[in-house]
């Protein structure tokens, strides 16, 4: 398999409680929004099928989906978190396997998918990357039938990913990569850091930031 054989499911809930506003449409330093950056990079990586699993009815979501040729599905049950996005996305997927990716990970390296693909076989339902022992369920491969378990769990009131995953056949795959690839934009501070990194990447001479470990100050 290659990325072209997968569906990319972008999980884009709308609560953003820690951000204080809808982070999906926050402008990044390069002029894109957080969500449009993920969709563009996914399309560039070679995914032919993209599902945008989002919460809420917003004109911007419809326009974004149309711009990147994505199929927009909205969560049937609001405020159910990423579990609902996974369930809705897998129900809409037409391929056997999908990459589920959080819409707030602006630096994810789509080449990592090639490391996961060899594990997607047999009875395995989820290929779950781990980083320093921590699961990365919003950057994992899911077999289409895993969506039924997510839908059933939500129906009985369980929406924690860890609980649902323990009921599936999971293949964990430790990765030795830069933790920044899984960086989430969840807070205003994280947003500022992401914008700074993107701006720095566009400079001919990147600005070096050095922080003192004791005081946290830097130059």
Predicted regions and their residues:
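Nucleotide and nucleotide-moiety/phosphate-recognizing core
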Residues: 2-158, 163-181, 188-189, 195-202
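Cationic, low-complexity basic patches in intrinsically disordered or flexible, solvent-exposed regions
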Residues: 205
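Short, intrinsically disordered C-terminal tails of secreted or membrane-associated proteins
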Residues: 214-217
């Amino acid at each position: 398999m290659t990325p072209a054989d997968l569906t990319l499911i972008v999980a884009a809930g709308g609560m953003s409680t820690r951000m204080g506003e809808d982070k999906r449409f926050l402008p990044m330093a390069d002029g894109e929004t957080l969500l449009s950056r993920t969709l563009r990079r996914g399309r560039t990586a070679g995914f032919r099928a993209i599902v945008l699993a989002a919460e809420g009815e917003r004109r911007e979501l419809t326009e974004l989906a149309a711009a990147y040729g994505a199929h927009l599905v909205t969560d049937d049950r609001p405020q159910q978190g990423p579990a609902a996005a996974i369930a809705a996305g897998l129900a809409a997927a037409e391929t056997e396997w999908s990459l589920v990716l959080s819409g707030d990970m602006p630096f994810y390296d789509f080449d990592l998918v090639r490391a996961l693909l060899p594990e997607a076989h047999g009875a395995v339902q989820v290929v779950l990357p781990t980083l320093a022992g921590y699961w990365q369920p919003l950057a994992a491969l899911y077999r289409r039938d895993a969506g039924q378990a997510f839908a059933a769990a939500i129906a009985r009131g369980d929406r924690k990913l860890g609980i649902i995953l323990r009921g599936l056949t999971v293949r964990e795959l430790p990765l030795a990569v830069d933790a920044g690839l899984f960086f989430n934009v969840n807070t205003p501070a994280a947003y500022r850091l992401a914008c700074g990194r993107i701006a720095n990447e566009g400079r001919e001479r990147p600005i070096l930031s050095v922080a003192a470990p004791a005081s946290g100050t830097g130059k």
